């Protein structure tokens, strides 16, 4: 049960501040946003900057600088803290560094008395979501990662650009790791009510073009990092959507880091990985176990095994 429509953000870097900004300009539900960062001056500066724009908002939100004590009565704790991916690094290169940072963060949050929902955005997000669940000992439905929400948004953007239709009419997902081993659910993709297979048959898109689109999705982060140093606007919007889905009890389907334990053929167990799930005020209401093609299932298992190889080396 939601208590106060209060969100605590841990991490005032590019991703965290982008989420905070997105939340303030598109807010109808959150009453209070508290920002925590190891760099207290950075957090205080973000709070000041956001508050100075209150006159321009449709609905004011109380933005405050805080400490871990402020997590006690929060509904949601969003974690964007941790080291960022550098040029040439994969997200999985950050496992050891960020898992150590997370142990301290999660311990402090839980010690405050927090019993709400964790939303994790730090990379590698699927593993960091699992780490959060293990360190917090929270029920799996109360620990959510951003998963492939950004990958899916990128996919729908590229498809909408190709077909010249609104992204809202593109129905497709990226599943698996938020990273290089992800895959697109082409066999289940529809443009409005029309299956992608029909567009292929009509010659309006080719298998080669689909492969190129998926490559663009996978390489998007590397390209943005090369050009501007980091990605943060789009994922900030994605986090905002997850938070609003929880606060607003939207029961919306989002491709998040979902806890998989036997779904999708039974081979994937005890892991968080990108898969569509219903998100509501309780966190994850249900991880959808829809049918995907054997080829896609093989890719899902392969992606999960890659993540599992890192998790199995960790001690909790």
From Swiss-Prot:
GO terms for biological process: glycolytic process; lactate metabolic process. One of its GO terms (molecular function) is L-lactate dehydrogenase activity. It catalyses: (S)-lactate + NAD(+) = pyruvate + NADH + H(+). It comes from the Bacteria. NAD(+) binds at residues 15, 37, 42, 68, 82-83, 121-123, 146. Pfam families: Ldh_1_C, Ldh_1_N. Beta-D-fructose 1,6-bisphosphate binds at residues 156, 171. Pathway: Fermentation; pyruvate fermentation to lactate; (S)-lactate from pyruvate: step 1/1. The keyword Heme does not apply. The modification Phosphotyrosine is found at residue 222. Its EC number is 1.1.1.27. It is found in: Cytoplasm. Substrate binds at residues 85, 91, 123-126, 151-154, 231. GO terms for cellular component: cytosol. Allosterically activated by fructose 1,6-bisphosphate (FBP). InterPro entries: L-lactate/malate_DH, L-lactate_DH, L-lactate_DH_AS, Lactate/malate_DH_C, Lactate/malate_DH_N, Lactate_DH/Glyco_Ohase_4_C, NAD(P)-bd_dom_sf. Homotetramer. PANTHER family: L-2-HYDROXYCARBOXYLATE DEHYDROGENASE (NAD(P)(+)), L-LACTATE DEHYDROGENASE. Catalyzes the conversion of lactate to pyruvate. Belongs to the LDH/MDH superfamily. LDH family. This is L-lactate dehydrogenase.
């Amino acid at each position: 049960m939601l208590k106060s429509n209060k969100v605590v953000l841990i991490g005032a870097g590019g991703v965290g501040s982008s989420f905070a900004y997105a939340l303030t300009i598109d807010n109808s539900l959150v009453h209070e946003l508290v920002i925590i960062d190891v760099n207290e001056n950075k957090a205080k500066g973000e709070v000041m900057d956001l508050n100075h724009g209150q006159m321009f908002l449709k609905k004011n939100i109380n933005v405050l600088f805080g400490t871990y004590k402020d997590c006690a009565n929060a509904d949601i704790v969003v974690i964007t803290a941790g080291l960022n991916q550098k040029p040439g690094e994969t997200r999985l290169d950050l496992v050891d560094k960020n898992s150590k940072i997370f142990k301290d963060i999660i311990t402090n949050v839980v010690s405050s008395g927090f019993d709400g929902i964790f939303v994790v955005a730090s990379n590698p997000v699927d593993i960091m979501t699992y780490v959060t669940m293990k360190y917090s000992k929270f029920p799996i439905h109360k620990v959510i990662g951003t998963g492939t929400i950004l990958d899916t948004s990128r996919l729908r953007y590229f498809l909408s650009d190709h077909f010249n239709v609104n992204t809202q009419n593109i129905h497709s997902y990226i599943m698996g790791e938020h990273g290089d081993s992800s895959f697109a659910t082409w066999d289940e993709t529809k443009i409005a009510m029309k299956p992608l297979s029909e567009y292929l048959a009509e010659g309006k898109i080719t298998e080669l073009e689909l492969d190129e689109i998926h490559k663009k999705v996978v390489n998007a982060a590397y390209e943005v990092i090369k050009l501007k140093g980091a990605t943060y606007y789009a994922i900030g919007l994605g986090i905002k959507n997850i938070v609003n889905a929880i606060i607003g009890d939207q029961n919306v389907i989002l491709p998040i880091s979902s806890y998989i334990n036997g779904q999708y053929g039974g081979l994937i167990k005890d892991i968080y990985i990108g898969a569509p799930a219903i998100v509501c005020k309780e966190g994850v209401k249900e991880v959808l176990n829809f049918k995907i093609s054997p080829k896609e299932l093989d890719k899902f298992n392969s992606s999960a095994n890659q993540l599992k190889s890192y998790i199995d080396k960790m001690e909790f």
